[in-house]
């Protein structure tokens, strides 16, 4: 039985929860989004067929350039004439990168698709000064070195990049420059102060940990005056968290992410010692599946289950829209993304259509209405540690709906 409380409208839904992520890894950017040699390439080297899909889905926000890649990325390598840009070794993915895609190209991509740019700075091998210079290059208005560097490239007006991430997954031993929560918070404080000195209007998103309440507490405690969000990442299937062959487990994933959101918010409240803190949660990397470069190439793996889970996770973010304002599906193109490309064109995978629907419908809503669902329950394995739950759902209705309670049988 499904009950819809049409009077009970809650929480404005941020369009940025329907955002996406791209990284210098495999064919997420090169050979797909950016491919000057493609017959689909425009004058700037971007594939027009991919741009069209990004515009169709009304992509609201793009996070770049990583990801693990960013922890050894130096933004100045990707500036200036392409033939003069250095080819570097990427420690994260054990590959070479020729830096053909850089800051200016990324800004052009956002302009072409209408997406809000979200840049993540290097807190692995990078410095606070380097990050501050990047902000100056993008947003500087004075007669200064890095603002003038942008002007020399033909961009008199600043890029007005509002959102900046303070490193990527710095808690993980797979990360270049990994550190403890205390070390990260201290280092991030220096980065945040330097970047805010350059442009006080920017919003900073600190590195959080989906399974690390102590980490999130410490980050919130130290950085509370300077950050707007704490970012957490989650890939449900593929890292021994959920088993793809267990249908009931998989259908629990959206509720599991809601619980992770609540735990992260509780850590932020505790760390700031402020129940009314404005610091939000950003799910700026998420996918139903982990990155598995061989398995992900098989488009037969993307089925109705992916569609249902993707929709369920987006519903989780909508239900938590008082806390969650940013989310980035990771990645959008290739690997386990919503679309796949090859030399002949673009394939829209099953989960793509969820984003096309949700971004067009929910971004027009002032909020969502309360619903309650009652039905059969089922037990989950001890590894998940929740059982006999009752499902809850949220639906967007026309704001002009009459005030009423609607009851219906759900099959």
Can you describe what each PLM-predicted range is?
Residues 237, 254, 258:
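Active-site-proximal helices and loops of the catalytic beta/alpha 8
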Residues 234-249:
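Active-site His/acidic residue clusters
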Residues 1-215, 220-229, 257-258, 262-411:
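Non-catalytic accessory regions flanking glycosidase/transglycosidase catalytic cores in CAZymes
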């Amino acid at each position: 039985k499904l009950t819809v409380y049409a009077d009970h409208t809650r929480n404005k839904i941020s369009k940025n929860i329907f955002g996406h992520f791209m990284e210098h890894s495999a064919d997420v950017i090169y050979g797909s989004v950016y491919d000057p040699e493609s017959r689909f390439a425009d004058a700037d080297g971007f594939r027009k067929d991919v741009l069209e899909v990004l515009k169709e889905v009304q992509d609201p926000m793009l996070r770049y350039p990583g990801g693990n890649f960013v922890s050894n990325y130096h933004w100045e390598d990707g500036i200036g004439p392409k033939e003069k840009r250095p080819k570097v070794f990427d420690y994260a993915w054990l590959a070479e990168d020729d830096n053909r895609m850089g800051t200016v190209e990324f800004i052009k991509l956002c302009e072409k698709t209408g997406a809000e740019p979200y840049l993540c700075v290097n807190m692995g091998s990078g410095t606070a000064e380097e990050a501050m210079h990047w902000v100056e290059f993008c947003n500087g208005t004075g007669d200064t070195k890095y603002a003038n560097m942008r002007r020399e490239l033909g961009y008199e007006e600043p890029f007005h990049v509002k959102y900046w991430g303070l490193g990527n997954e710095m808690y993980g031993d797979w990360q270049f420059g990994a550190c403890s929560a205390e070390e990260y918070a201290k280092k991030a404080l220096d980065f945040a102060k330097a970047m805010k000195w350059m442009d006080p209007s920017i919003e900073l998103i600190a590195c959080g940990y989906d399974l690390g309440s102590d980490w999130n507490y410490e980050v919130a405690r130290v950085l509370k005056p300077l950050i707007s969000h704490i970012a957490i990442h989650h890939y449900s299937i593929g890292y021994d968290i959920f088993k793809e062959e267990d249908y009931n487990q998989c259908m629990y994933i959206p509720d599991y992410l809601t619980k992770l959101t609540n735990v992260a918010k509780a850590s932020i409240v505790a760390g700031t010692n402020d129940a009314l803190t404005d610091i939000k949660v950003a799910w700026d990397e998420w996918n139903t599946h982990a990155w598995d470069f061989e398995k992900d190439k098989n488009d037969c793996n993307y089925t109705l289950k992916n569609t249902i889970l993707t929709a369920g996770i987006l519903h989780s973010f909508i239900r938590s829209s008082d806390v969650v304002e940013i989310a980035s599906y990771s990645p959008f193109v290739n690997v386990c993304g919503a679309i796949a490309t090859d030399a002949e064109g673009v394939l829209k995978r099953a989960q793509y259509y969820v984003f096309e629907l949700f971004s067009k419908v929910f971004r027009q809503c002032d909020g969502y209405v309360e619903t309650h669902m009652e039905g059969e329950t089922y037990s989950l394995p001890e590894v998940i540690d929740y059982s006999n739950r009752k499902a809850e759902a949220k639906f967007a209705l026309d704001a002009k709906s009459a005030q009423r309670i609607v009851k219906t049988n759900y099959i």
